[in-house]
């Protein structure tokens, strides 16, 4: 790192190279041809994300070769099974970026949806180009609208092929998103550049050709700046396969340039970028010149032996042309970066060419050195040239020739002895004999392009002597910014780390200058006032931690539509304080501004005002006036010298004099005379007047005062206040009078009645004293507070200033005028804010929300720092600051560039395999694919492929979390496939699931028809033939044509069915029994029933699902049939989850298309099996279709239990508790706590009428119990202690829980009529070690309440005081949490939609193939099931931790019977491609952390990316029977094991940290005191980790798993579950819940289902109250009304509530369109900046209409470009 000094260099002229510099005589050369490289950046394999890291890799000869990430080729495995064979033969090794898919789309205002359609080459190029500009010290925004050029090498279209060949999912923006031109064009678009923007495809020479184009653009004057580079990304195997076949790829996947073993190259990926300027311009702009490009050339090698064969003569020609352009003698070039692709033909050819140019006539001891970067980072093809260029620059800069990597034996086909060139084989200092370091760079394309460039080091004599600013003196401003607020802390963290490491010795002022003048200032800003280097790191740390700091400002700039111009407001009397000028008079700018006025004023008053500032002697009003003016003049000078300029000014009272000076209406000397001579006259009236501030508007105050002249409104301060002035006695009386009216008044510290008729006597003397005409020109807008019209242009002459003394100060009018003119930023220029409050009031009264009022100084605060703080506040609100004026010195290079906030973005390809034939037409709602006759028979088969993308129904039809084809779809398939009108004996055997791709056949053989399928394997090693065919549904069909059927009298049926149901009865019924969604869109619009029959009017219009009409084949009977089978299942009196199992007969009586509106007549016909008949009727009653004897089977599960995920997975919410009508009597409180201070503190909060007793231990309490009043009205408050560290948690938890158990036992065994209240401290927040230590008490309290109801509660408090009111009024709750002063109780509720993760981010709790996944309890039943699930989801490496070890593998075939299932399971996992490691370790032991860490190192597995803590011990005992040892035997392992894992894998170190907890303590399972306590600890630990930023920390609070684990279902467990009103879950349901919770950012998930109860029946446990299903046979009128209005949010009518409601809804719509979270949508950001393009605008408009039910014009977002604007528009519409 170094600093760059400002310099000047004469325009034009020749290069002043020293006479003894060789090379300049090679040809005539003009200095104006020199092109400077002023910035560079790169991102390549091996974690080399910047040039400095790359340099270290070069020096250490690192080779970044590795295997291709598994995700890259995965779509090709799925697309066609034949690919697997080819991919196995394709080279999979190369040089790959760690996470090519990562992109910071928010930084660039690109939505995740659009980013997914962009080639990763565009994404990485955007980021690298931005980094290069930052490295150059060029703010990107400064280039907006400029002629800056972008030339970029690109020639890989892998991603384009990947996404565009997925035809069903092609989208509009994929064209530009995957085009070559999109790479440079995207950079130009983002930066708003107007210069050339061109993609260069010259194969492997592309990026060096791009550099050449950039050089040419600058030399020809097309562009002042050029951004050039190249990129390569390997997203598919196609080209690699081509190169394999051509023999160009190295078999071992590595480059070996110049080596005898070189037999092909290895492909690499990444990007590099350079920023170019003319050298002359770079010097004028004080840029850091990294290197100088002297010359470059591009040519073609003509017709060679083959188009891909190299040509040495052409390579030499290109090099000589570049040298000639450069005016450089080749003998002066010390190093050449060779192309060197490691091919047997290419390397010798290239070396001969280099030797022919650079090696000729060179002495053996003075060779030209050569090297190649490719063995380090691979061959980047289109990006290769620029990376070689970057290496050459680094070599010149560092003065070291880095050694060649992967070099063992020099290529024997090259004559090295006579070549005159030498490969660098060890790090070699650049020869000191070279007067200037020069290098050449070669790059060639396999199509024949040859390119060459010549560069040299920057000659420092071109720059004048550097200016040495020296160490920073005094405080300075450190600026950070980002497009989103969350970036500020990250940027602060990155900068602090750099300043304490690489940048620890750098000049602070240079760092500040760089951040202020050489970096962009985004909308979210932070400005830190710092004293020195150490202070800067500390303040940065505070910002990174989210800690407030007194001199740190952080805010968003004012909205895009709001003016950022600043109004300076100069306040009047009242801001003074004794030391206000003592520091400032040492400021040279301040002193220079006031010093000329000192002599003038001293001549008038006989005293030096500067001396008065030194002494702080200005108690009298006349001195205050003079010094107020002087301070304001000095402060104005300081502000202006710091780059702050007012666009308008306002003066308040005496402040109007300084305001006029700044505006140009007065000179500072004239202002000094006015204020001084006026102050001298004030001596005549000092001590006679008084002033008070009145909390009433001026008009109302005037009305009260009447027409009095001795008492007037002197100052109109704000819309709600004014100042009254007059005789001091009258003012005092008036204050009392106002007080009597209930009006607040405040005395103003003044003994003069300013701005009142009292001063009329001074007007003539003032005219005489001033005695001269003043008629200046105003050059800054000046609002008057002395005139009725604040915009009045009255000349500031003698009359004006005379009137100013006595006229009312109309501050409110002046501020209102400024607001009307668009101003929103106000700076009070004073020594303490006097009018800021009034300005704020006025702005708020105007209905403004986006504004700022900023003080310049604060009383008794450091003046220099506070002035900077005010500038910081202005900057952070968007004011223009001339930072160059404030920081004109040197700037520093090497500061960290933008810290990206990456998210993985990769287009998921769902295209069906090519081998499956034609796919069925989903719009016809059948499974009929390609029709294939069977030769020689009348049999034919329809073949197709079924998966989630080809499901033949538009909605969703899940059963226990698995999507299945509805029965209606299968019946429709049979009808369409046979062409018949009648089906008989339809048997629905096995549901057709679509959770995995499957081949489907519909077989029609004579009069039989069936649907069969088999799974398509995702394992490349398995053939589809290995899967078995499954028969799903069978039927017989009849060819006869049915005639018309009977007609049913609808009116008679309606009259007979007297009970009218709610329209949504069937949907609600189905949802409650587990059918959470419908496969087809239909809605019931009328519904009637009696005990055995139903009549329902059904609408099957596809628009039911939304505004977009679905693709719909009008001949499909499936939607009507779906309504029939669904409504037909709801006729039965008992609720259960039922599916059609058999239908005796299906008949269609019409050849016309099914109706959109029909009636369903349902008759129950049950015998031993639930059965119904369903007729489909026209609106006139004609029978169109009929289901006869549709028999239903009850699905495994519990009647009355909803099957949807929403009914399975819950959060714990904390709604306010309902107070009891009769309070609990509490007269005495016994405090038990080991903390004496806490006892005293809590006792002090009790009212005097409540007696208290204090004990330090339970034993102390028990021993004194006989002397205590243990009677009704007495309660025990148990207050556990606090802990300071995690190390103390296990012991403390054990102590706290056992103390509580002892208290309970004592009270129960003694039959004492007292209650126990346990008071924990903010356990719910989970932030502190104390919270963790106390958390087991939560679980214990719930179990105690279950076993001993009404014995008291646990109350989690937020303040250290006895919550007496809560103890008295909140009764019957086991655990109470006090939050925001409100007592709350726990309830299960649906997962909050606000926590739903954006679809683009994907789920968070699932594995990836490159990680290791650790499971404790790994050999247990649940542990192995978790392992199976993780492998199913892609995990390839498992580490199973268990207390027991497995025998050696060689003995596995002879293990005991009890181990055989475990061994078999592990072998099954391994057969599916997983590597399974078993680690015998007791995770609860004290040395577990050390043992686990050692084992992980020893195993050398890939990093652990996920942890599942599934270990545990269960030992049920009732509270009264448990012993301390037994209790601790369960609790200690839970806590110790979890803490051990927490220490080894701290927050954010793994993708997920899952802990298996239990719902037992939540619903109060008896006997689980210890188990429940331990699980409550796990729950809080998850919260603790989440508070530390770990988004993958989750505690699953499971119900029992059916047949599995410690809580597996048994008769006892089932009885306990039923008693608590819940059910168990199956293994599949459990993991479906896991995947559902993975979609949410939440630290816990309660997994259980509630049993249905009859309406009016009490809930088994209160926590279930909000999720329990209540059975209702029919709805009352009120219930129907409620049902009719359900689903609509209560919309506030007006005011802030409406705006908040609209803001939430509109941000939600925008987030849905952009596929991001609503929290990430900035209401004040332009929608276009967020990524909403013209296509998305259409979708957004539709979303807004659907959500807010208001027609939206197509042009709305044109005139309302932000969410805030849209809120205003919709608010107006709703208001009307």
Swiss-Prot record:
Record region (N-terminal hotdog fold): 925-1044
GO BP term, example: fatty acid biosynthetic process
Query: Which domain of life, per UniProt?
Result: Eukaryota
Q: What does this protein do?
A: 6-methylsalicylic acid synthase; part of the gene cluster that mediates the biosynthesis of patulin, an acetate-derived tetraketide mycotoxin produced by several fungal species that shows antimicrobial properties against several bacteria. PatK catalyzes the first step of the pathway which is the synthesis of 6-methylsalicylic acid via condensation of 1 acetate and 3 malonate units. The pathway begins with the synthesis of 6-methylsalicylic acid by the polyketide synthase (PKS) patK via condensation of acetate and malonate units.
Q: What is this protein called?
A: 6-methylsalicylic acid synthase
Instruction: Please tell me one Gene Ontology term that the record gives under cellular component.
Output: cytosol
> For the modification O-(pantetheine 4'-phosphoryl)serine, which residues carry it?
1734
Which compartment or compartments is the protein found in? Cytoplasm, Cytosol
- Location of region: Product template (PT) domain: 1205-1657
What residue stretches are annotated with the Ketosynthase family 3 (KS3) domain?
A: 32-457
Where is each Carrier domain found? Answer: 1700-1774
Catalytic residues as annotated in Swiss-Prot or TrEMBL: 204 (for beta-ketoacyl synthase activity), 339 (for beta-ketoacyl synthase activity), 379 (for beta-ketoacyl synthase activity), 957 (proton acceptor), 1113 (proton donor)
Coiled-coil zones: none
Q: Copy out the induction comment.
A: Expression is correlated with the production of patulin. Expression is positively regulated by the secondary metabolism regulator laeA. Expression is strongly decreased with increased sucrose concentrations. This decrease is lost in the presence of malic acid. Expression is increased with pH changes from 2.5 to 3.5 in the presence of a limiting concentration of sucrose, 50 mM. Natural phenols present in apple fruits such as chlorogenic acid or the flavonoid epicatechin modulate patulin biosynthesis.
Its practical application is: Patulin was originally used as an antibiotic and specifically trialed to be used against the common cold, but it is no longer used for that purpose since it has been shown to induce immunological, neurological and gastrointestinal effects. Genotoxic effects of patulin with dose-dependent increase in DNA strand breaks in brain, liver and kidneys have been detected in mice. However, more recently, it has been proposed that patulin might also have anti-tumor properties.
Q: Any phenotype upon disruption?
A: Completely abolishes the production of patulin and shows significant slower colony expansion.
In the UniProt entry, what is the domain comment?
Multidomain protein; including a starter unit:ACP transacylase (SAT) that selects the starter unit; a ketosynthase (KS) that catalyzes repeated decarboxylative condensation to elongate the polyketide backbone; a malonyl-CoA:ACP transacylase (MAT) that selects and transfers the extender unit malonyl-CoA; a product template (PT) domain that controls the immediate cyclization regioselectivity of the reactive polyketide backbone; and an acyl-carrier protein (ACP) that serves as the tether of the growing and completed polyketide via its phosphopantetheinyl arm.
Region Malonyl-CoA:ACP transacylase (MAT) domain: start-end pairs: 567-880
Ranges for domain PKS/mFAS DH:
925-1201
Sorted keywords for this record are:
Cytoplasm, Multifunctional enzyme, NADP, Phosphopantetheine, Phosphoprotein, Transferase
Q: Where is the composition biased (Low complexity)?
A: 1-18
The protein's annotated catalytic reaction(s) are: 3 malonyl-CoA + acetyl-CoA + NADPH + 3 H(+) = 6-methylsalicylate + 3 CO2 + NADP(+) + 4 CoA + H2O
- Report a single Gene Ontology molecular function: fatty acid synthase activity
Pathways involved: Mycotoxin biosynthesis; patulin biosynthesis
* Positions of region (Disordered): 1-26
């Amino acid at each position: 790192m170094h600093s760059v000094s400002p310099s000047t260099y004469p325009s034009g002229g020749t290069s002043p190279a020293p006479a003894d510099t060789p090379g300049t005589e090679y040809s005539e050369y003009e200095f104006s041809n020199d092109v400077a490289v002023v910035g560079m950046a790169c991102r390549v394999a091996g974690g080399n994300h910047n040039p400095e890291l790359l340099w270290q890799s070069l020096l250490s000869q690192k080779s970044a070769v590795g295997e291709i990430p598994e995700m890259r080729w995965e779509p090709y495995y799925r697309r066609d099974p034949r690919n697997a064979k080819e991919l196995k033969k394709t080279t999979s090794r190369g040089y790959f970026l760690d996470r090519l898919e990562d992109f910071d789309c928010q930084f660039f205002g690109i939505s995740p949806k659009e980013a997914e359609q962009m080639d990763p080459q565009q994404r990485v190029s955007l980021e690298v180009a931005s980094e290069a500009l930052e490295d150059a010290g060029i703010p990107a925004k400064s280039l907006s609208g400029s002629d800056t050029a972008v030339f970029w090498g690109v020639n890989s279209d892998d991603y384009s092929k990947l996404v565009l060949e997925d035809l069903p999912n092609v989208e509009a923006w994929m064209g530009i998103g995957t085009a070559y031109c999109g790479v440079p064009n995207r950079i130009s678009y983002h930066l708003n550049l107007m210069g050339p923007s061109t993609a260069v495809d010259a194969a492997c020479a592309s990026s060096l050709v791009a550099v050449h184009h950039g050089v040419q653009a600058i030399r020809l004057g097309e562009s002042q700046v050029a951004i050039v580079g190249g990129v390569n990304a390997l997203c598919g195997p196609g080209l690699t396969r081509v190169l394999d076949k051509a023999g160009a790829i190295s078999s071992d996947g590595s480059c070996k340039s110049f080596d005898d073993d070189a037999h092909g190259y290895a492909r690499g990926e990444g990007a590099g970028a350079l920023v170019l300027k003319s050298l002359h311009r770079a010097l004028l702009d004080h840029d850091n010149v990294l290197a100088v490009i002297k010359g470059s050339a591009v040519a073609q090698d003509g017709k060679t032996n083959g188009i891909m064969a190299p040509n040495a003569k052409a390579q030499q020609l290109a090099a000589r042309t570049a040298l000639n352009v450069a005016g450089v003698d080749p003998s002066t070039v010390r190093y050449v970066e060779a192309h060197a692709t490691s091919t047997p033909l290419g390397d010798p050819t290239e070396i001969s060419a280099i030797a022919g140019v650079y090696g000729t006539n060179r002495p053996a001891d003075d060779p030209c050195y050569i090297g190649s970067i490719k063995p380090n980072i691979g061959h980047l093809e289109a990006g290769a040239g620029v990376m070689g260029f970057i290496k050459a620059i680094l070599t010149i800069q560092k003065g070291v020739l880095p050694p060649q990597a992967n070099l063992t034996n020099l290529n024997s086909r090259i004559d090295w002895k006579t070549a005159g060139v030498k490969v660098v084989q060890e790090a070699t200092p650049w020869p000191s004999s070279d007067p200037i370091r020069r290098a050449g760079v070669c790059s060639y394309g396999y199509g024949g392009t040859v390119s060459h460039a010549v560069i040299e080091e920057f000659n420092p004599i071109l720059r004048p002597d550097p200016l040495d600013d020296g160490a920073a003196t005094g405080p300075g401003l450190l600026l950070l910014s980002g497009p989103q607020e969350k970036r500020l802390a990250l940027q602060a963290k990155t900068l602090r780390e750099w300043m304490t490491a690489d940048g620890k010795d750098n000049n602070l002022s240079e760092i500040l200058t760089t951040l202020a003048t050489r970096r962009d200032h985004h909308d979210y800003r932070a400005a830190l006032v710092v004293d020195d280097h150490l202070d800067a790191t500390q303040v940065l740390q505070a910002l990174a931690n989210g800690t407030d700091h007194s001199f740190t400002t952080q805010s968003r700039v004012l909205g895009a539509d709001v003016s950022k111009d600043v109004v300076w407001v100069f306040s009047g009397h009242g801001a003074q304080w004794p030391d206000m000028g003592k520091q400032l008079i040492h400021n040279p700018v301040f002193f220079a501004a006031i010093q000329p006025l000192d002599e003038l004023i001293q001549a008038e008053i006989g005293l030096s005002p500067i001396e008065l500032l030194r002494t702080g002697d200005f108690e009298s009003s006349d001195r205050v006036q003079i010094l107020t003016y002087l301070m304001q003049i000095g402060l104005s000078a300081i502000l202006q010298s710091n780059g702050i300029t007012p666009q308008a000014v306002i003066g308040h009272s005496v402040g109007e004099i300084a305001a006029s000076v700044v505006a140009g209406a007065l000179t500072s000397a004239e202002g000094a005379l006015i204020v001084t001579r006026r102050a001298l006259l004030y001596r005549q009236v000092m001590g006679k007047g008084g002033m008070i501030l009145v909390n009433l508007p001026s008009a109302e105050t005037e009305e009260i005062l009447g027409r009095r002249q001795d008492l007037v409104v002197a100052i109109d301060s704000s819309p709600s206040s004014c100042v009254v002035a007059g005789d001091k006695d009258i003012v005092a009386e008036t204050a009392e009078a106002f007080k009597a009216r209930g009006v607040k008044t405040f005395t103003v510290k003044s003994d003069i009645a300013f701005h009142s008729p009292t001063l009329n006597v001074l007007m003539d003397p003032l005219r005489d004293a001033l005695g001269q005409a003043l008629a200046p020109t105003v050059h800054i807008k000046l609002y008057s507070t002395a005139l009725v019209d604040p915009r009045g242009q009255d000349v500031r002459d003698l009359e004006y200033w005379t009137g100013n003394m006595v006229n009312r100060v109309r501050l409110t009018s002046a501020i209102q005028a400024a607001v009307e003119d668009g101003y929103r930023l106000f700076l009070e220029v004073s020594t303490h804010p006097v009018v800021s409050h009034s300005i704020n009031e006025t702005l708020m009264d105007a209905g403004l929300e986006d504004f700022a009022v900023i003080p310049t100084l604060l009383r008794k605060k450091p003046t220099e720092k506070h002035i900077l703080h005010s500038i910081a506040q202005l900057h952070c609100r968007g004011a223009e600051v001339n930072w160059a004026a404030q920081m004109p010195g040197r700037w520093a290079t090497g500061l960290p560039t933008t810290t990206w906030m990456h998210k993985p973005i990769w287009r998921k390809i769902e295209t069906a395999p090519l081998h499956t034939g034609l796919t069925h037409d989903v719009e016809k709602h059948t499974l009929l694919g390609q029709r294939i006759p069977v030769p020689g028979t009348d049999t034919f088969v329809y073949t197709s492929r079924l998966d989630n993308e080809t499901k033949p129904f538009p909605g969703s039809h899940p059963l226990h979390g698995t999507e299945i084809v509805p029965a209606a779809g299968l019946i429709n398939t049979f009808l369409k496939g046979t062409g018949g009108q009648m089906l008989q004996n339809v048997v629905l055997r096995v549901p057709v699931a679509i959770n995995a791709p499957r081949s489907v056949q519909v077989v029609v053989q004579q009069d039989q028809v069936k649907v069969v399928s088999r799974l398509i394997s995702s394992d490349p090693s398995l053939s589809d033939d290995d899967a078995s065919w499954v028969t799903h549904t069978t039927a017989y069909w009849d060819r006869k044509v049915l005639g018309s059927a009977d007609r049913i009298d609808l009116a008679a049926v309606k009259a007979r069915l007297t009970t009218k149901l709610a329209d949504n009865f069937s949907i609600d019924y189905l949802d409650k029994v587990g059918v959470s969604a419908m496969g087809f869109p239909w809605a019931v619009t009328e519904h009637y029933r009696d005990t055995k029959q139903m009549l329902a009017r059904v609408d099957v219009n596809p628009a039911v699902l939304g505004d977009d009409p679905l693709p719909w084949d009008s001949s499909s009977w499936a939607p009507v049939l779906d309504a029939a089978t669904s409504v037909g299942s709801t006729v039965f009196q008992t609720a259960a989850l039922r599916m059609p199992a058999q239908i005796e007969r299906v008949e269609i009586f019409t050849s016309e298309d099914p109706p959109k509106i029909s009636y369903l007549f349902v008759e129950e016909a049950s015998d031993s099996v639930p059965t119904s008949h369903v007729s489909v009727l026209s609106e006139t009653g004609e029978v169109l279709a009929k289901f006869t004897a549709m028999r239903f089977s009850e699905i495994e599960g519990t009647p009355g239990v909803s099957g949807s995920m929403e009914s399975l997975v819950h959060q714990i919410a904390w709604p306010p508790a309902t107070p009891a009508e009769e309070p609990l009597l509490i007269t005495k409180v016994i405090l038990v706590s080991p903390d004496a201070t806490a006892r005293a503190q809590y006792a002090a909060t009790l009212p005097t009428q409540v007696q208290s007793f204090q004990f330090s231990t339970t034993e102390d309490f028990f021993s004194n119990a006989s002397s205590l009043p243990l009677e009704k009205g007495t309660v025990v408050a148990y207050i556990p202690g606090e802990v300071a560290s995690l190390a103390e948690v296990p012991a403390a938890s054990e102590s706290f829980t056992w103390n509580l158990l002892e208290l309970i036992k004592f009270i129960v065994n003694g039959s004492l009529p007292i209650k126990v209240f346990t008071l924990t401290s903010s356990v719910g927040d989970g932030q502190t070690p104390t919270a963790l230590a106390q958390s087991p008490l939560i679980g214990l309290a719930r179990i105690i309440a279950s076993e001993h109801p009404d014995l008291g509660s646990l109350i989690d408090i937020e303040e250290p005081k006895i919550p007496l009111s809560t103890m008295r009024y909140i009764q019957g709750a086991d655990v109470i949490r006090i939050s925001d002063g409100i007592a709350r109780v726990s309830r299960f509720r649906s997962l909050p939609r606000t926590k739903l993760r954006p679809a683009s981010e994907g789920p968070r709790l699932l594995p990836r193939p490159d990680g290791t996944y650790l499971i404790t309890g790994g050999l247990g039943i649940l542990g192995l099931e978790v392992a199976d699930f993780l492998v199913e989801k892609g995990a390839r490496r498992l580490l199973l931790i268990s207390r027991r070890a497995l025998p050696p593998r060689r003995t596995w075939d002879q293990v005991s019977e009890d181990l055989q299932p475990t061994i078999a399971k592990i072998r099954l996992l391994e057969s599916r491609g997983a590597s399974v490691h078993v680690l015998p370790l007791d995770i609860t032991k004290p040395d577990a952390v050390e043992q686990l860490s050692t084992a992980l190192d020893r195993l050398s597995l890939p990093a652990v990316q996920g942890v599942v803590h599934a270990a545990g011990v269960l030992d049920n005992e009732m509270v009264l029977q448990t012993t301390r040892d037994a209790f601790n035997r369960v609790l200690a392992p839970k806590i110790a094991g979890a803490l051990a894992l927490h220490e080894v894998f701290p927050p954010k170190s793994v993708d997920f940290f899952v802990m298996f907890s239990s719902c037992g303590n939540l619903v109060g399972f008896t006997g689980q005191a210890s188990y429940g306590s331990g699980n409550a600890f796990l729950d809080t630990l998850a919260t603790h980790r989440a508070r530390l930023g770990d988004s993958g920390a989750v505690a699953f609070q499971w119900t029992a798993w059916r047949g599995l684990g410690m809580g597996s279902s048994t008769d006892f467990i089932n009885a306990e579950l039923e008693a608590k009103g819940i059910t168990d879950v199956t293994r599949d349901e459990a993991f479906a819940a896991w995947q559902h919770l993975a979609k949410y950012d939440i630290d816990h998930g309660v997994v259980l289902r509630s049993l249905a109860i009859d309406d009016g029946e009490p809930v088994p446990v209160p926590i279930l109250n909000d999720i329990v299903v209540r059975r209702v046979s029919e709805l009352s009128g009120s219930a129907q009304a409620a049902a009719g209005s359900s689903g609509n949010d209560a919309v506030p009518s007006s005011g802030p509530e409406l705006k908040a409601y609209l803001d939430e809804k509109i941000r939600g719509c925008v987030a849905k369109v952009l596929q991001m979270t609503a929290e990430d949508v900035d209401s004040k950001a332009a929608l276009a900046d967020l990524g909403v393009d013209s296509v998305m605008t259409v979708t957004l408009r539709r979303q807004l209409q659907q959500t807010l039910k208001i027609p939206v014009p197509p042009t709305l977002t044109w005139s309302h470009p932000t969410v805030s604007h849209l809120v205003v528009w919709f608010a107006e519409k709703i208001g009307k």
